[in-house]
């Protein structure tokens, strides 16, 4: 298990495919990330209202609410949320919508864990910088 910034990064994986959720969870936890899963966009929104996550990785094509709609709703809740989308071949228009809507990156299925880990390393660095900036701002706002 890694003990870098990974161990502080919390990730929500959203996919209606149980195998994808399980493989991502196991792979990312092995690298030291804290991982939760949701099997639908609706479950993801409920989870995000109860818990804090640095990153959401979501499938684009899901049941009643797709990943594009989920991304837009999450961005309304938290504009700084780092969202990554997963797609199967042939969903390029949806990927473009997600990137225009604020997704940080996209991963094509079949997934390559190495690509995801590279993006999450960048996400961890961003989260650390934002946390540091927020802490400094909070201290200066309180006169310390």
Task: Locate each region found by the language model.
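Two-component/phosphorelay signaling modules centered on CheY-like receiver
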Residues: 18-36
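Short amphipathic alpha-helix used as the core "switch/output" element in two-component signaling
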Residues: 46, 68-80, 97-100
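Non-catalytic signal-transmission and effector/linker regions of two-component phosphorelay proteins
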Residues: 1-10, 130-131
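The short loop immediately C-terminal to the conserved phospho-acceptor aspartate in CheY-like receiver
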Residues: 56, 60-61, 85
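The feature encodes the CheY-like receiver
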Residues: 21, 63-64, 87, 91
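Acidic catalytic/metal-coordinating carboxylates
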Residues: 39-43, 65-69
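C-terminal output helix
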Residues: 91-93, 111-121
């Amino acid at each position: 298990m890694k003990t870098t910034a990974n161990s502080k990064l919390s990730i929500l994986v959203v996919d209606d495919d149980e195998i994808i959720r399980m493989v991502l969870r196991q792979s990312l936890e092995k690298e030291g990330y804290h991982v939760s899963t949701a099997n639908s966009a609706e479950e993801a929104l409920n989870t995000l209202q109860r818990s804090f996550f640095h990153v959401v990785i979501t499938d684009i094509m899901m049941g009643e609410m797709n990943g594009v709609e989920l991304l837009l709703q999450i961005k309304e809740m938290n504009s700084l949320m780092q969202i990554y989308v997963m797609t199967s071949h042939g969903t390029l228009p949806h990927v473009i919508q997600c990137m225009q809507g604020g997704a940080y990156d996209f991963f094509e299925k079949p997934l390559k864990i190495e690509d995801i880990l590279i993006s999450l390393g960048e996400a961890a660095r961003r989260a650390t910088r934002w946390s540091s900036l927020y802490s400094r701002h909070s201290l200066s706002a309180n006169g310390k």
